[in-house]
């Protein structure tokens, strides 16, 4: 309706063919294109006022809460048998990439929210907006409020630290295991990593210190992303039928790892040992190289160094 309360129809605002032709002729003027293209790199006054450091490398701002230098190139390569690992999460079927790495608003009371507020940040924004800050994304790993980790009674980003059985956030547990020098695995059911092909779902898994994900089946793209981050996907039978409780110590033999090869997995609880034959979901020779190098970035870095 217009200001006088009369109804306005599409036909009233639809441009005539003459108006369309006039604007078309204006936009198709070659002189307009030429004048704009000649100054395309000059920018306006605000663009010209931006301070740009002269450097061949990006000048990382350590105070930034949006973009931080990620640790991908500095992390140590730890390929080899996985021994004495603990289960960080015990999950059911259809765990999505949003369960693994949420993209929505950051809860002020979440681990990531508390971290940002301690830095004096008032507008927390979303995980998606802060995906350039690995410190935020790491704290957001498996922090989806709807996640059900079967190691604990409550929903959300919680788990148990073993052997003490203390309940804490997934982030806190991962850091505690890191201090103790304990490698980690995740055990899940069918269709692990379904949903959108979110790269941070694989990145945060690696950042949490997870060496392998053991599941009944994997979503295609997430499986590939895990391999690219140096995390080994292993298919195993339904863990619920194996008698696994989640407090076991896990050993995985990888000495003779091959493409889609068999992998021996042991779940040890006291004197009890459950032996499982898994299958490495490393589907090509190049993926095998990625896993052995600790991920695709390290593979590329090492290749460039050797060629140089």
Q: Residue spans of the language-model regions?
A:
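Fe-S-dependent hydro-lyases/dehydratases of central metabolism
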Residues: 1-308
